């Protein structure tokens, strides 16, 4: 088997984005400053490897503030953002909290709030029950914001009260799918207000474009990331739509389906924005044990975005 040659096309950019790096650093610096345990409301980012690593360092993950028995301990809000009510609850409990919401998600929160204050009813394009969507919808009164998830919902959206409407989007959506939804809304509501700068973040866009760039050359495509990672799931969809029908999401090298790889000559590899590079390294190392590997990294753009952590942790 070792004699078989495999060409790996390594998609770049891939892996951690600036918002994820910032969120992880916030947890680590909080543990250094306050000691363990430091509580984190929801997984700081959607990756099991990252969450397990932070647990080992002293982070305790909870879904509700009520689960924290010792309210004198600090709590961190995840990169996905939280509804306003959660911030109010933390203040009412007199808790020390650190907000690790990605600055690009916070930008969407501010947009939605400002547009609503200017008299607009808000449409959020996103996936129901995703923490980021819950957080964005939780910035406004329930009656001021509606969720649209797909083209059908955009076609059937009823602005029966003829309100002024504006849209914002989740930051981790499929760029192409979202374009189609926006096109439908603009055709139906000619005066709909859109964000000054699109809400899908730079990292989501870059990773999707990088995958799209090489997918048609690949017999198989592996996206390394967790099943609950929205941006990782979107990368699988992009690979399939861009010419590689056998695209799969795997968490780690332990999930490599070797029985399928035997017939492949070219394998594409990328990773979600919450997946550390060590998972890609482990994936390639495992393949090297069985095949003769030739690796080509195909980079479409350099990323140099850095987000500062809160001053209180410096």
PLM regions: where:
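The feature marks the mature, well-folded catalytic cores of soluble enzymes
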Residues: 1-267, 271, 277-314
């Amino acid at each position: 088997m070792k004699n078989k040659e495999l060409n790996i096309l390594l998609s770049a950019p891939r892996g951690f984005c600036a918002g994820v790096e910032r969120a992880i650093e916030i947890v680590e610096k909080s543990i250094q400053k306050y000691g363990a345990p430091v509580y984190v409301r929801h997984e700081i980012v959607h990756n099991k490897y990252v969450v397990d690593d932070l647990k080992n360092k002293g982070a305790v993950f909870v879904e509700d503030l009520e689960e924290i028995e010792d309210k004198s301990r600090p709590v961190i809000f995840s990169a996905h953002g939280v509804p306003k009510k959660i911030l109010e609850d933390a203040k009412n409990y007199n808790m020390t909290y650190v907000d690790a919401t990605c600055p690009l998600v916070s930008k969407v929160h501010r947009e939605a709030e400002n547009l609503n204050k200017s008299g607009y009813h808000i449409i959020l394009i996103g996936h129901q029950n995703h923490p980021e969507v819950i957080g964005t919808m939780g910035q406004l009164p329930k009656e001021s914001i509606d969720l649209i998830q797909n083209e059908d919902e955009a076609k059937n959206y009823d602005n029966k009260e003829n309100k002024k409407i504006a849209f914002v989007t989740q930051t981790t959506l499929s760029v192409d799918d979202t374009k189609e939804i926006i096109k439908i809304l603009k055709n139906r509501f000619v005066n709909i207000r859109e964000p000054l700068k699109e809400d899908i973040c730079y990292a989501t866009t870059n990773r999707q474009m990088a995958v799209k760039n090489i997918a048609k050359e690949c017999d198989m495509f592996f996206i390394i990331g967790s099943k609950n990672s929205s941006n990782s799931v979107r990368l699988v969809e992009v690979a399939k739509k861009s010419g590689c029908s056998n695209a799969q999401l795997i968490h780690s090298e332990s999930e490599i389906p070797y029985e399928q790889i035997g017939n492949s000559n070219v394998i594409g590899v990328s990773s979600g924005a919450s997946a550390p590079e060590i998972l890609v390294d482990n994936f390639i190392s495992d393949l090297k044990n069985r095949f003769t590997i030739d690796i080509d990294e195909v980079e479409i753009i350099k990323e140099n975005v850095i987000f500062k952590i809160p001053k209180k942790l410096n």
